[in-house]
C-alpha cells in the first residue's frame, strides 16, 4: 500500500507540473505520458516472466507446442478444472468433512474479472490507434462495458478470496507466504475498486486525485507482477500445456 501511495504522489506531481489540455483523464495526464510510463512498466516485467518461463519449460522437458495441447490447457484453465478436485466435488481446505466449489468460483471471478479489464485496455488501444477513436468513451462502448464488468468481478472476487483465506487452514500452504498472498489479493482488488470509484466519480472535482490513486495502484501491480502470486498463473498454464503433451505422448505410445 505504501507503494501505491508513493506512485500516486508521483502522478499527482506530474499533474501539478502541467496538464495536456485534453479531455477527461487526459486533462490530468496526457495520453503520451501514460504510454511512456505504463508501456515499459508492463512490458519489462513480462520479459522477466518470459525468461523465467523459458527456464521452467526446459526444466520440465517441454516439447514444441501443438495447437491441440494449447487448446486442452486453455480449456482446463478456463474451467478451473483442477479446483473441482479429482472427484468433482471441489476443495475441502476449510473443513475436511465438507467439500465446496466456493474456491473455484472465486478464482473464476478473479480470473475473468482481470481478463475483462485487460480486454478493456486492449480494445481502447485498438480504437485509439487503429480507428482514431479517442477517450473518453461512453458507457455502452466496449472499453467501458468490459472495464466496469471486469472491475466488479475483480473487486468481489478478491474480497471473497480474502474472507476465504481467513477461514482456511494456513498449515495446508506455506505459512510464511500467507501475508504476501493476502497483500497481493488486496492490491489486485484495490485496482478493481479504485477503477470503479474513478468511473463513478470521474465527472467530479475529486477525479484528479482518484486518477492518481488508481494509476498508482495499476503501476504497483505491474512492477510487482514477477514477484507476486500473479506469476503463478503463467507457470500453471505452462504446466497444463506440458501435462497435455505428456497425455498425448502416452496415448500415442499405447
Please identify what each model-predicted range represents:
Residues 1-254:
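Membrane-embedded alpha-helical bundles of multi-pass integral membrane proteins
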Amino acid at each position: 500500500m505504501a507503494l501505491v501511495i508513493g506512485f500516486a504522489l508521483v502522478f499527482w506531481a506530474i499533474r501539478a507540473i502541467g496538464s495536456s489540455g485534453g479531455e477527461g483523464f487526459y486533462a490530468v495526464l496526457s495520453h503520451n505520458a501514460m504510454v511512456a510510463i505504463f508501456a515499459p512498466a508492463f512490458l519489462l516485467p513480462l520479459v522477466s516472466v518470459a525468461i523465467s518461463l523459458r527456464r521452467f519449460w526446459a526444466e520440465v522437458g517441454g516439447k514444441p507446442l501443438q495447437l491441440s495441447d494449447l487448446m486442452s490447457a486453455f480449456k482446463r484453465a478456463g474451467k478451473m478444472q483442477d479446483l473441482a478436485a479429482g472427484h468433482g466435488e471441489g476443495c475441502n481446505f476449510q473443513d475436511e468433512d465438507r467439500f465446496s466449489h466456493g474456491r473455484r468460483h472465486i478464482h473464476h471471478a478473479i480470473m475473468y474479472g482481470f481478463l475483462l479489464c485487460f480486454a478493456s485496455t486492449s480494445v481502447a488501444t485498438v480504437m485509439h490507434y487503429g480507428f482514431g477513436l479517442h477517450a473518453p468513451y461512453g458507457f455502452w462502448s466496449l472499453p467501458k462495458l468490459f472495464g466496469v464488468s471486469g472491475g466488479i468481478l475483480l473487486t468481489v472476487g478478491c474480497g471473497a478470496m480474502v474472507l476465504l483465506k481467513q477461514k482456511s487452514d494456513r498449515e495446508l500452504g506455506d505459512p510464511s507466504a500467507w501475508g504476501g498472498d493476502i497483500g497481493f489479493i488486496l492490491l489486485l482488488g484495490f485496482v478493481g475498486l479504485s477503477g470503479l470509484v474513478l468511473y463513478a466519480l470521474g465527472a467530479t472535482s475529486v477525479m484528479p486525485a482518484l486518477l492518481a490513486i488508481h494509476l498508482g495502484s495499476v503501476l504497483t501491480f505491474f512492477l510487482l507482477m514477477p514477484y507476486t502470486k500473479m506469476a503463478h498463473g503463467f507457470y500453471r498454464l505452462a504446466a497444463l500445456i506440458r501435462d497435455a503433451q505428456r497425455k498425448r505422448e502416452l496415448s500415442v505410445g499405447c
